[in-house]
Design a protein with these regions (language model features):
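Intrinsically disordered, charged low-complexity linkers and terminal tails
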Residues: 1, 71-73, 88
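Conserved NAD+-utilizing ADP-ribose enzyme module
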Residues: 2-12, 18-65, 91, 100-112, ...
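Active-site-proximal specificity loops/subdomain of glycosyltransferases
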Residues: 62-84
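Short glycine-enriched loop/turn motifs at secondary-structure junctions
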Residues: 84-90
Length: 199
């Protein structure tokens, strides 16, 4: 696959880190590195599974609460079925190839990463990484419903590295589009030359 690679060559990436998160402070300030979960194809990745017997009304609160998880849940089902050799989003470190991609992500997702620090990092040792258009995640998180066929299409497009710009998408009867923002999922270890947690 063109968007999947394994290497032991040192490579630079960029990552947003939360200086107020205790785990980030421990990993970055004391150890100077982040490590993904180990790649174990046999272990289940989903912590919570939807109730197959659930049939009652969903409140707006519940809908907002589970929307992000359901996006990850559906992507993980697709990965397990058709892209099992790819890094799992629930185990990987989320990175960016270029500063340009980080700026685009920050502009679109300021509420998510606005208070975080942007750091350059380097891979150490053997690692597996894949590149994907994170705009598919944005589409999955829009407040609309999707049938199983659409969910499968979006999942396959995301995992294969396809860009949203190559498709005409609709949400609630209206055209939906975003510029692509390429994210990297990495299984392995990254080190930081700059361990500082202040700007």
């Amino acid at each position: 696959m063109e968007n999947l690679s394994s290497s032991d060559q040192r490579r630079d990436f960029f990552v947003f880190v939360d200086p107020n998160d205790w785990l980030t402070r421990h990993q970055l300030a004391l150890i100077g590195s982040f490590s993904s979960s180990p790649a174990d194809a046999s272990a289940p990745k989903l912590m919570f599974l939807p109730n197959p017997e659930f049939q009652t009304f969903i409140s707006p609160f519940q809908n907002n609460l589970v929307r992000n998880y359901m996006a990850e849940y559906n992507l993980e089902l697709c990965r397990e079925q058709d892209f099992a050799h790819y890094p799992c989003r629930l185990q990987a470190i989320f990175l960016f190839d270029t500063e340009e991609e980080t700026r685009k992500y920050l502009a679109r997702h300021h509420n998510h990463v606005g208070g975080r620090l942007l750091k350059r990092c380097q891979t150490i040792g053997r690692y597996l990484w894949s590149r994907h258009d994170s705009s598919w995640i944005d589409f999955l998180r829009v407040g609309h419903s999707m049938d199983a066929e659409t969910l499968q299409f979006v999942g396959r497009a995301y995992w294969s590295g396809d860009s949203v710009k190559n498709h005409q998408l609709t949400s609630m009867g209206k055209a939906w589009s975003e510029d692509p923002i390429m994210e990297v999922l990495l299984l392995g270890r990254i080190d930081f030359d700059d361990r500082g947690l202040t700007t």
